[in-house]
Amino acid sequence: NMYASALASNKKYTFICLLPQHLEGEYWTAVELGIHEAIATYSDFNTSVKINYYDPYDYHSFVNASEAILALQPDGVMMAPTAPQYTKGFTDRLQASDIPYIYIDSNIKNVPPLAFFGQNSRQSGYFAARMMMLLAREEKEIVIFRKIHEGIVGSNQQENREIGFRQYMKEHHPSCTILELDLHAERNDEDNEMLDEFFRTYPMVKNGITFNSKAYIVGEYLQSRGKKDFNLIGYDLLERNVTCLK
């Protein structure tokens, strides 16, 4: 009986989670809550967890955080991976130390983990494009909104969603122009000004999508400007996102 054996064992297990830095109420808040609930539920197994963070817009931050984890030699690691080349440097050293690891949120197939918990991001983006065009119909222009810093969008998941989205558009709506608006990840106070400029330049664009969990940035802007004729698709049931649906 594995359960009885674990209860009888005096071994203590330490796991480390590596997550993107985030504000209270954002997507990763719920993930953290789930981690702590799991540890509480399985406290009989003498498990503990430590959560480390990295800046999702800075690859070197991920590298530094991974170095700190390796120095602690935990029994297992759960991570939200960054770009494959930086993730692989970390996972190679975990494997060399016989430390198992799992991915959450986004998967890297050529750097396979023990397990992955999340969606198929490309299929999600592909399906989102289909939904978008059910709304856009014969419209000739749509827009992708991003939060970006120095060319980095912040997660593999967002990149793969966009790849799937563009694949569908290329296959089924090749004549539709895909516009882009990159909002500064580090300068939120400029969002409304940049959105104002975009809609002055493209007043006829009525459909857009964001592949991150911050659809509320555009949604709240649309509400503040009284724009009720714009269709916006986003991800994740954050409270501020849900409020924009009401």
Regions inferred by a protein language model and the residue ranges of each:
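Short beta-strand elements in bilobed, periplasmic/extracellular small-molecule ligand-binding domains
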Residues: 39-60, 143-144, 166-189
